[in-house]
Amino acid sequence: MSTYEISSETLAIIPIENFCSRVVEKDNTIIVNKTPMQIIEDSCSFFGSSYFGRAKGTKGLIGVSHKAPIIIEESKEIIFFPTSSPRLYECCWISLKHINRYQKQESNALVLFNSGYSLAVDMSYGSFDNQVLRATRLESVLRFRKNI
């Protein structure tokens, strides 16, 4: 597949070989001929903004600019966060709303999604927990502002 827009069904976007991605949805896995960052950028554009605009919005809302969570689409509260610097090829993007729980697995984090899918993430539990907390803060501010 050469194009993909993130939806409320998307759980994670994982880089694989040849600058492609494995996109995990609730009931499906799709191989996309784009990097995770390209999919994030395309999805931001699809919903009327740009990645840089969304990143600037995150900084304005919660003051985070490094490994910042991104609001892909506001009305459905689709928020993704990176597992490393988004500039790095190995960066995965995780959907906040689909996480059931996460736990430490050796030196990494294991993410358990509501659908039953699990993903071992190449980052420490503490770093993953921090990313979830940042994304949750962003979600909270977004909900508050939507209800004003």
PLM regions with names:
Residues 1-93, 100-148:
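Eukaryotic intrinsically disordered, low-complexity regulatory linkers and tails enriched in Ser/Thr/Pro
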